Amino acid sequence: MNGPILVALDGSQFSEAALPWALEFSRRFGVGLDVVSVAEPIPTLEYTEWNAEAQRWTEDYVERVVSDCSGDAGGEITGAALVGPAVGKIVERAAEIGAAVIVAATHGHGPLARAWLGSVADGLIRTASVPVLLVRPREEDEEVVVELPDVEAILVSLDGTPDSEAALDHAAAAARAFDADLHLVQVVTYPSEVASPYLPQT
C-alpha cells in the first residue's frame, strides 16, 4: 500500500471509532492519513443559511481532527471538508489522492442498521475502486466503546472468481504489516437438484 489512508467521518463519536484503525494502518504502512467529512446540502433556498453553516462546521471539524491526530500517523496528515453527496464525494476524494484504503465506521445488523450502512458504508463498498475497511464499534449503555486495533488473523472469502481473488494481494499486505495469520475460505454449496434426505449435508 503506497497511498494515504482515507478515513471518512461525520462528526459523531460513533464515526470517530474508525480513527484508531486508520491511524494504525497509516503507521503500519508508513503512509499518510487523509481526514474527510462531507456536508450534504439541502437543495432549497430556505436552507441556504443552514447549508453555509453546515459547511463551516465541517471545515472546522476536519481542521480540529487533523490537529488532534498530529504526530500520530505514519506520514503527512491532510484533510478535506467536502460538500455534496457523501458517497460520491468520498469516492472522488479517494481517487484524487490515490488512497490505498477507505476506513469508516458502521453499525451492525440491528433494526436501524440500514439507516447508516445503506446510505454511506454500503455505498462505499459498492462503488469504491479501493479496499474499504468498515469498523463496527461496540455500544454499551448508549456509549460508543472505542477499541484499539488488535489484528491477529485476516480472513479472505473466495468464491472461485477473479473478482473475489482481487482481495488477496491487499489481504496479504495487511497480514504482513500486522504480522497476522492469513486464512482463505471458500464455501461449496450443493445444487438443489442433488438434495436428498439421505445426504445430511443437503
Give residue ranges: language-model regions.
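Small/aliphatic-rich secondary-structure junction motif
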Residues: 1-52, 149-201
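Gly/Ser-rich helix-loop-strand patches that form or flank binding pockets
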Residues: 1-4, 19, 24-28, 91-143
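Generic structural signal for helix capping and beta-alpha/helix-loop junctions
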Residues: 42-45, 89, 111, 142, ...
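A short helix-to-beta-strand connector/capping loop
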Residues: 72-78
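Charged docking surfaces used in two-component/phosphorelay signaling
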Residues: 81-89
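Active-site-proximal loop->helix
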Residues: 145-147
